[in-house]
Amino acid sequence: MAAAATPGAKRPADPARDPDSPPKRPRPNSLDLATVFGPRPAPPRPTSPGAPGSHWPQSPPRGQPDGGAPGEKARPASPALSEASSGPPTPDIPLSPGGAHAIDPDCSPGPPDPDPMWSASAIPNALPPHILAETFERHLRGLLRGVRSPLAIGPLWARLDYLCSLVVSLEAAGMVDRGLGRHLWRLTRRAPPSAAEAVAPRPLMGFYEAATQNQADCQLWALLRRGLTTASTLRWGAQGPCFSSQWLTHNASLRLDAQSSAVMFGRVNEPTARNLLFRYCVGRADAGVNDDADAGRFVFHQPGDLAEENVHACGVLMDGHTGMVGASLDILVCPRDPHGYLAPAPQTPLAFYEVKCRAKYAFDPADPGAPAASAYEDLMARRSPEAFRAFIRSIPNPGVRYFAPGRVPGPEEALVTQDRDWLDSRAAGEKRRCSAPDRALVELNSGVVSEVLLFGVPDLERRTISPVAWSSGELVRREPIFANPRHPNFKQILVQGYVLDSHFPDCPLQPHLVTFLGRHRAGAEEGVTFRLEDGRGAPAGRGGAPGPAKASILPDQAVPIALIITPVRVEPGIYRDIRRNSRLAFDDTLAKLWASRSPGRGPAAADTTSSPPTAGRSSR
């Protein structure tokens, strides 16, 4: 066995390193936790279901090693501890945005642990100005004050330090329970955090996800997205994911008044698509809880507790590898614990759905000369696959694009097909170039089949809408349509999968793209709320508990035409590229901030930051 490294001793140079790997830092945070600590004994069962400590191992006492089972040999310290001895010690408590030490969660006197039934949802949607000013950029500049090199700060450690500092500010403002900041930091720290891989990201990141489920209506959601790379700001080149050099200032302003009519159509009708999905197609993970053992598990999402369109909504979740990437999923079918945390059962598949509402099919029934209107009438009369394809092709840029076998699609449309029944002379002869990763994803998804649910004309007398059977007698039509890996919608789902996988690697992911087609209302339909009813043989909550007993289409929402549910296949190897490139982007930005320091003001100017964010919805 090699002798333990002594403080101050030089470490041998690494053998040949991958030129694409990030530069060495004193405190790497890319190692698996098992690599650093070795196996851990199974934690004891909590005395109450869903106790916060049941999700993550408890932190060891300060200054003591993270002990294992009795008789187990002491684990060696992380190499980062010995490497760091030549420089200033990394603070082992959260820092304020200005770089000063915050309250030590272990040693300083303070409030007791929070109420056992604390909930992240208690945070109001509106934040005071002084909290809106606490951006990640400002915090990062403050962290640079106390180090001799920018490489002393790792991306995951910096993000968690920021999140801890922010919850302390929320606590000081009376917006969360007293003692919650101390409690979350204890859960986060697995060992002296001079080594960033020695922290557990889920306590803090899960807290903020649960607190921001209102998304655009929540100012905390907007604040957390500042300095966070999302699917809308991540670019894709021939070599894979590309992080902008301006990632630290992304998502600084979200203005509703700048959004297009197509975006507003999506905002209004996403709840419609959610209602249809849970009413007819997808079982809820929060329904049917009757036994006493699980009685307290679904505090957030008990049946009837929320409006149907908010069931299984998600806030912003940051990746647990580097904290650089964030995603706000439309729908994640996953139970939650009493505090609101996502709490899937081990090795249980996680189905999630990205909803897209296609405004270009929202024709006006009062215009009988519109090609889409006449194609819709034919579809309602015949209900055949041929009539459905004719309706899809009734607009100038159809929402399903054909490309020939052996070729690749362009990036224009989110749904594509190679089936000759969809052959379109306008696209049959196209030749497109494609990167190797995208081509592999096209081949991976080419065998996927979508499910199409068709809806009939509203019954004005009974004020109901229901699915209708196809001409074949089946209620759900299977069509050889798959998600286009070259389209931004696919990339968005890929990023969401990366973030989820970083927290729940043992749960197989089941991503889907949901496409809602709806039309404007006819004169007699204006102002009417329609109740959703089952059609003949309609599925009720397939794959889980039955769908909600009551669901409606509100007067401002479109009349549904069809719902297309498309499974998505992703190659997990791409996740490694995202992780590696996010670290490189962080290191590059820190180097620039370090080089731009004012000589007379220390390592960084912490008060240099952008304006506070404004709430609003953007593509996630």
From Swiss-Prot:
Keywords: Endonuclease, Exonuclease, Host cytoplasm, Host nucleus, Host-virus interaction, Hydrolase, Nuclease. Residues 40-49 have a biased composition (Pro residues). It comes from the Viruses. One of its GO terms (cellular component) is host cell nucleus. InterPro entries: Herpes_alk_exo, Restrct_endonuc-II-like, Viral_alk_exo. It is found in: Host nucleus; Host cytoplasm. Pfam families: Viral_alk_exo. Residues 1-10, 603-620 have a biased composition (Low complexity). The record marks E270, D330, E354, K356 as: Required for function. Residues 11-23 have a biased composition (Basic and acidic residues). Interacts with major DNA-binding protein; this interaction increases the nuclease processivity of the alkaline exonuclease. This is Alkaline nuclease. The lineage of its organism: Viruses, Duplodnaviria, Heunggongvirae, Peploviricota, Herviviricetes.
